[in-house]
From Swiss-Prot:
Record comment regarding domains: The N-terminal domain interacts with the head of the 30S subunit; the C-terminal domain interacts with the body and contacts protein S4. The interaction surface between S4 and S5 is involved in control of translational fidelity.
SUPFAM superfamilies: dsRNA-binding domain-like, Ribosomal protein S5 domain 2-like
Organism the protein comes from: Clostridium acetobutylicum (strain ATCC 824 / DSM 792 / JCM 1419 / IAM 19013 / LMG 5710 / NBRC 13948 / NRRL B-527 / VKM B-1787 / 2291 / W)
Protein name (record): Small ribosomal subunit protein uS5
One function term, GO molecular function aspect: structural constituent of ribosome
Keywords assigned: Ribonucleoprotein, Ribosomal protein, RNA-binding, rRNA-binding
Source superkingdom: Bacteria
Database matches in PANTHER family: MITOCHONDRIAL RIBOSOMAL PROTEIN S5
Function: With S4 and S12 plays an important role in translational accuracy. Located at the back of the 30S subunit body where it stabilizes the conformation of the head with respect to the body.
Biological processes, Gene Ontology terms: translation
Gene3D superfamilies recorded: 3.30.160.20, 3.30.230.10
Disulfide linkage: none
GO annotations of cellular component type: small ribosomal subunit
Residue stretches making up the S5 DRBM domain: 10-73
Amino acid sequence: MRIDPSTLDLKEKVVFINRVAKVVKGGRNFRFTALVVVGDENGHVGVGTGKSAEIPEAIRKGIEDAKKNLVEVAIVGTTVPHEIYGEFGTGRVLIMPASEGTGVIAGGPVRAVLELAGLNDVRAKSLGSNNPRNMVNATINGLSRLRTVEQIAALRGKTVEEILG
């Protein structure tokens, strides 16, 4: 189910800008790629990529792309409901719940995604590739698969008490 970005108060953060050069007879032609994360800090986050000859235009395109790829994140209080392992390519991210007051313990690109998703107390360990694109997508992959006890109970047709034992 697609999330309508116009109903959300989204904040954006540029995670990574890459410059590539095409060598031609007259010199080098530079183009830019921007990796952008958007989120409302209340359980919605998305990632997008924009490419252009100018950086601001690449960022604008990245924001538009990110708004099209929003996912909903299950949040319990200020943390995640359970430990989850996100994978994308060779990028692997382990996201773990943390007690209140811990803060966001995560490196670079992963931190941006977790903060814009609205998680205030969470730990994350980046395993495998440290490529920003793979790390961000692995984080999104993990967050999109999070489920609360209530969601699992509804899927199984049971009460929360039956699941928790």
